[in-house]
Swiss-Prot record:
This is Acetate kinase. Catalyzes the formation of acetyl phosphate from acetate and ATP. Can also catalyze the reverse reaction. ATP binds at residues 14, 208-212, 283-285, 331-335. It comes from Acetivibrio thermocellus (strain ATCC 27405 / DSM 1237 / JCM 9322 / NBRC 103400 / NCIMB 10682 / NRRL B-4536 / VPI 7372). The gene is ackA. It is found in: Cytoplasm. Substrate binds at residue 91. Its main location: cytoplasm.
Length: 399
């Protein structure tokens, strides 16, 4: 069974075609600059070369058509016709409280996704456009929505309710939702396999560290707390996001800097974090280069980030009453030995110790624990597309 996985952005569309008989990627690619000048499709057939096709992609429907053309092309394709696509799995950023797991897309599900637009105004509209475009091109193919928020719907009430008047939660569903759920779920299950233990018996802390970053406490395979909140702005200091700040800072700044709502949103989401502290970049590699050359602000940005991750790990060890493994994933978590080392230094008290040589690993699965560590430390590259494909298969196989 071949499953097409789609991740739609406002001007981009990423895709993978996965053969679920052996969970192998047949082809993958991205349509970029949709609706803009100089749009193109970048397509890679597994084992083949990457091809860039310049094409006027005025909208997402044209982008989907171009994806199907590439997948079925005699030279660069991997299937003979689009009838070989059994189902489509869509990444949806926000499912609100409505979706505790993935769902087959019908009119009711579409309405519920639209209802969540105000919770994710930057992402859900693009996700909806992607679904509608796919339905026009592949009208008879079942489609599944896989939500970034769904994995965290198992959090207990005391973990997700903010200490605001309860009526505000009831009126606006204003609460912690958490994000990166598909990634946290994938690496938690993979960690259980690597440890050779049933996930139901494990306490895990998963660290999704990329330009956006979040930590998750996983008990028995279920999320019990996570660092992101009502939006992805809560929690850790990130590439351009501030993470946790005293809420009073916002009104203070609005008054002092004469900022409006859009200004303060942009300030906290786009100009803060590692970029704001360092004044160098939101890319950790650039910031590390600057720090190594003696840039004090760059070093401070790295220290603040690592300190934040350390605090959440400590916090979640308390929440879980211990931990069996700490897992690092995503761009920084998978590839940055310095960040992993700084995050986990002086954690012997908790039984967490890493082997510095093993820690040099980049972009592949590894157990980097020291031989005498009581707690395992794992590096696991995330695979959100495969997790989306698995969820899609689970729901459509009995149709």
């Amino acid at each position: 069974m071949n499953i097409l996985v789609i991740n739609t952005g406002s001007s981009s569309l990423k895709y993978q075609l996965i053969d679920m008989t052996n969970e192998s990627v047949l082809a993958k690619g991205v349509c970029d600059r949709i609706g803009l000048e100089h749009s193109f499709l970048k397509h890679t057939k597994t084992g083949g070369e990457t091809v860039v096709i310049e094409k006027d992609l005025y909208n997402h429907k044209l982008a989907i058509q171009e994806v199907i053309s590439a997948l079925t092309d005699e030279k660069i394709g991997v299937i003979k016709s689009m009838s070989e696509i059994s189902a489509v799995g869509h990444r949806i950023v926000h499912g609100g409280e409505k979706f505790k797991e993935s769902a087959i897309i019908d009119e009711d599900v579409m309405k519920a996704i639209r209802d969540c637009v105000e919770l994710a105004p930057l992402h859900n509209p693009s996700n909806i456009i992607g679904i509608e475009a796919c339905k026009q091109i592949l009208p008879d193919v079942p489609m599944v929505a896989v939500f970034d928020t769904a994995f965290h719907q198992t959090m207990p009430r005391h973990a997700y309710i903010y200490a605001l008047p309860y009526e505000i939660y009831e009126k606006y569903k204003l609460r912690k939702y958490g994000f990166h759920g598909t990634s946290h779920k994938y690496v938690a299950h993979r960690a259980a396999q690597m440890l050779g233990k049933p996930i139901e018996s494990l306490k895990l802390i998963t660290c999704h560290l990329g330009n956006g970053a979040s930590i998750c406490a996983v008990k028995g395979g279920k999320s019990v707390d996570t660092s992101m909140g009502f939006t992805p702005l809560q929690g850790l200091c990130m590439g351009t996001r501030s993470g946790n700040v005293d809420p009073a800072v916002i009104t203070y700044l609005m008054e002092k800097e004469k900022m409006n709502i859009n200004d303060i949103n942009n300030f906290l989401n786009k100009k803060s974090g590692v970029l704001g502290i360092s004044g160098v970049s939101s890319d950790f590699r650039d910031v590390q280069d600057a720090a190594e050359k003696g840039d004090d602000r760059a070093q401070l940005a790295l220290d603040i980030f690592c300190y934040g991750v350390r605090k959440y790990i400590g916090k979640y060890i308390a929440v879980l009453n211990g931990v069996d493994a700490v897992v690092f994933t995503a761009g920084i978590g998978e590839n940055n030995a310095y960040i992993r080392r700084e995050v986990l230094k002086d954690m012997d008290f908790f039984g967490i110790k890493i082997d510095l040589d093993k820690n040099e690993v980049k972009g592949k699965e590894a157990d980097i624990s020291a031989p005498d560590a009581k707690v395992k430390t794992l590096v696991i590259p995330t695979n959100e597309e495969l997790e989306i494909a698995r969820e899609t298969l689970r729901l459509v196989k009995n149709l």
